[in-house]
Design a protein with these regions (language model features):
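Class I SAM-dependent transferase core
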Residues: 1-85, 115-118, 122-131
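S-adenosylmethionine
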Residues: 6, 105-108, 112-230
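Residue-level signal for pocket-adjacent positions within structured domains
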Residues: 49-50, 91-93, 205-207
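Conserved beta-strand/loop positions that form the S-adenosyl-L-methionine
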Residues: 87-89
Length: 230
């Protein structure tokens, strides 16, 4: 969409949606011009995203620190040219946020709800990300989804499900030796301890809890790293 000020998304009728707070300077220092794509995505979340019920209006003032910076911190853990599947992508967090700043990645956004996949498809088209981002409608456990996105190097998820369910859904999508990078909060270690026996049965190698993005967001993003056994 063109013609609006940075950080806003014009409606179809021409008026502007809710403006998002300006992006922090650190974003441009880290990601250069790609940060502008993330700012446009932020405007989609603050405008159409809130109108369609994908993001609560009260989240708009803290959109950067609570949602976007928390998500793009994941980029630090992904090697060049990696293939990433975002399970239960919702409004695109974290997968679409990461795709905005990492054009080298191949990203699949897996989401079962039509209103969410419609939103994701519109944003991907508007930001011209279609060459390296796909929107896949379905549940992670669906055979059709497995056929499309299986054998991934990395699967990620944010605020989707407890760790045991997330492993059940995501491990079939991973190649042997592939990694689940689950964004979790302060309870990450407790979840690992709670599901220790289940993870052993699933032959999940626990690599621990990684803190990343300390220069972007405080507190840093906390990621549970599990590897599918070979």
């Amino acid at each position: 969409v063109t013609g609006g000020r940075p950080g806003s998304v014009p409606e179809r009728g021409g008026s502007e949606q809710t403006a998002v707070p300006p992006p922090p300077d650190i974003l441009f220092r880290r990601f250069g011009p790609r940060a502008e794509l993330l700012a446009r995505y932020a405007a989609w979340l603050a405008g159409p995203g809130t109108v369609r019920g994908l993001l609560g209006p009260r989240e708009v003032p803290r959109l950067w620190e609570r949602h976007l910076l928390n998500s793009v911190a994941l980029a630090d853990l992904l090697p060049d040219g990696a293939r990433l599947v975002d399970v239960g992508s919702g409004a695109g967090l974290p997968g679409l946020a990461v795709a905005c700043v990492r054009p080298d990645l191949a990203v699949d956004l897996v989401e079962p709800l039509l209103r969410r996949t419609d939103f994701l498809t519109e944003v991907v088209a508007d930001l011209a990300l279609g060459q390296h981002v796909r929107v896949v409608r379905g549940r992670a456990e669906d055979s059709a989804v497995l056929d499309k996105v299986g054998s991934a190097q990395f699967v990620t998820a944010r605020a989707v499900a407890p760790l045991d369910r997330l492993v059940r859904w995501s491990f079939p999508l991973l190649r042997p030796g592939g990694s689940l990078l689950a964004l979790k909060g302060t309870g990450a270690e407790d979840e690992l301890a709670e599901h220790q026996q289940f993870l052993a049965r699933m032959r999940a190698e626990v690599r621990g809890v990684i803190e990343c993005g300390a220069e972007l967001v405080d507190p840093p993003t906390r990621v549970v790293h599990l590897v599918r056994g070979r």
